[in-house]
Amino acid sequence: MSITIKDAAGIAGMREACRLASEVLDAITPHIKPGVTTLEIDRLSAQVMAAQGTRSATVGYQPPGYPPYPGHLCTSVNHVVCHGIPADKPLKKGDIVNVDVTVITPEGWYGDNSRMFEIGEVSIAARRLCALTFDAMWLGIEQVRPGARLGDIGHAIQKFAEGHGFSIVREFCGHGIGKVFHE
């Protein structure tokens, strides 16, 4: 797989897109609580994107062999690993939910962020999973440098996860961003 090396303008475009995606997460964070549905969160995210002049990369996205994705974001509750579809089931205390936001700026840059939320008091196992996942993410980020390979990132994350009694999901290994959703 080849990676397109971005120039300064491209990096600035990606940073702005990711900042805007993070802004969506910041705006919806106070609403992620018991009794709220992920469909309500999805609708709110669409309003935030419209107000900031971005649009969702996920709504209508159709990978080969699948129907178009219906949500403006992905909401993965509890056992759902990723790409959960927003639904009308209310969140409850003890749930964990990952919200994945991908925006497209008017200039065509994609920004992709996700954030994990603990709904009320969660189990010790859920809290541990969230904390170790966060630490694994930063360990992966620390591997990014000129000359490093994508495999270095994955290896560091996998070694860390397995060293703490967890595993990685081999079917989903991440993707790049730029002017294409899954660059």
Regions found by a protein language model. Give the residues of each.
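Active-site neighborhoods and metal-handling regions in enzymes and metal-associated proteins
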Residues: 1-183
